[in-house]
Amino acid sequence: MEEVRGENEGKLEKEGKPEDEVEPEDEEKSDEDEKPDKKAKPAPRQGKPEEEAKPDEQGQDEGKPEKQGKSDGEGKRQGESKPDSQAKSASEARAAEKRPAEDYVPRKAKRKTDRGTDDSPKNSQEDLQDRHVSSEEMMRECADMTRAQEELRKRQKMGGFHWVPRDAQDALVPRGPRGVRGVRGGGGRSQRGLHDIPYL
């Protein structure tokens, strides 16, 4: 609650109506500003005085407490808004004049992300270019990663040929022992048994 009060006080200072400090020139203005707020609040009742009176009379005659509850709710809502009249802005006061308190429907809050999108067409074009450039960079990085992975695979296949220069390693295709199954390079149709090899 303290944070809300701090925000309201900040708004009042911005509007030129601080609660504690009032300059002599501002006293007349603040009195004039408060008078329209007081006049604005009875306006919803002035719009429908007969309609509000009828449900109360019918509710008492017929004994329906639901309609009495609604009228009490209206009184509470308007009574609650009186202490905060200084904190209300002019637009809120106008909105209160247009519709009664029971028809209050909260508005949809605007998303913060939507506010920054309509800056200017130049900014949007720059954003598109930045996105395009970043996608190109991503493609380059992916290509570099695939190259590095391929080189790593080749080195792993080559195994222990550290004495051979790298240029020669790329040309060599590693071949494992031909006669043993389950080893790299071995296997396939050309595999022979130990008895088929002429010299052991």
Swiss-Prot record:
Modified residues (Phosphoserine): 30
Compositional bias annotation for Basic and acidic residues: 1-19, 47-85, 94-106, 114-153
Cystine connections: none
Region (Disordered): 1-200
Stored InterPro entries: TF_A-like/BEX
GO CC terms, sorted: nucleus
Biased composition (Acidic residues): 20-34
Source organism superkingdom: Eukaryota
Phosphoprotein listed as a keyword: yes
Pfam families xref list: BEX (PF04538)
Family: Belongs to the TFS-II family. TFA subfamily.
Functional summary from the UniProt entry: May be involved in transcriptional regulation.
Name of the protein this chain belongs to: Transcription elongation factor A protein-like 3
Natural source organism: Mus musculus (Mouse)
